[in-house]
């Protein structure tokens, strides 16, 4: 009898595991992009570029701050290249988990390369050693980055 009760409790415990945090299926990926990340890299060509056009890039999140190896940033990647989003927020892995697809509206953003890494963010201050600045606000970040859940 105790074994039966233990077996029932164990089976109920294991059956409650759901796929709450799993990434969305690939069929949920929107077709809203109009430029590849590799084309952005060619556009930058060693400069800090302000984007005035309605450019939209998309990619899967491949790295975030969960393992503490990226500070306040996350990286999206498409089939051509990758770009670092200078979010400026803590615990980004809760908002942008690995495997999610993100479309990024680049209008009114700055893009540049820093040590070979393509970055998107706000305009850096004149005294800054960095080519782009963090968005540093969830409101600003939400205007540009849209994850598919």
Residue ranges and their predicted role:
Residues 1-17:
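Sec-dependent bacterial lipoprotein signal peptides
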Residues 17-71, 75-149:
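OB-fold nucleic-acid-binding modules
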């Amino acid at each position: 009898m105790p074994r039966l009760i233990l077996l029932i409790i164990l089976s109920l415990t294991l059956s409650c595991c759901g796929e709450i945090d799993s990434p969305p299926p690939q069929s949920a990926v929107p077709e809203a992009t109009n430029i590849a990340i590799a084309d952005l890299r060619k556009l930058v060509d060693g400069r800090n570029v302000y984007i005035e056009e309605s450019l939209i890039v998309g990619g899967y999140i491949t790295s975030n701050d969960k393992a503490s190896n990226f500070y306040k940033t996350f990286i999206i990647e498409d089939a051509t290249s990758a770009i670092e989003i200078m979010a400026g927020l803590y615990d980004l892995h809760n908002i942008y988990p690995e495997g999610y697809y993100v479309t990024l509206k680049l209008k009114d953003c700055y893009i540049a390369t820093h040590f070979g890494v393509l970055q998107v963010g706000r305009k850096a201050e004149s005294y800054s050693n960095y080519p782009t600045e963090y968005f540093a606000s969830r409101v600003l970040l939400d205007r540009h980055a849209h994850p598919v859940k």
